[in-house]
Amino acid sequence: MAVQQNKKSRSARDMRRSHDALEANALSVEKSTGEVHLRHHVSPDGFYRGRKVIDKGSDE
């Protein structure tokens, strides 16, 4: 088991953790329908950048 030789200071500990913060997902609003969706993803209605790309019809 690894054991430290010298105690790490609060400053060194906090600087190491500076990259651990979580970020919120970037959301976009579809211009034609107003739906909120993830960036670079198709909206739940099947629209992407104002165009219908997926027909959400019946699955027969």
From Swiss-Prot:
Pfam families: Ribosomal_L32p. The keyword Mitochondrion does not apply. Keywords: Ribonucleoprotein, Ribosomal protein. One of its GO terms (cellular component) is large ribosomal subunit. GO terms for molecular function: structural constituent of ribosome. One of its GO terms (biological process) is translation. Belongs to the bacterial ribosomal protein bL32 family. This is Large ribosomal subunit protein bL32. It comes from Azotobacter vinelandii (strain DJ / ATCC BAA-1303). The lineage of its organism: Bacteria, Pseudomonadati, Pseudomonadota, Gammaproteobacteria, Pseudomonadales. The gene is rpmF.
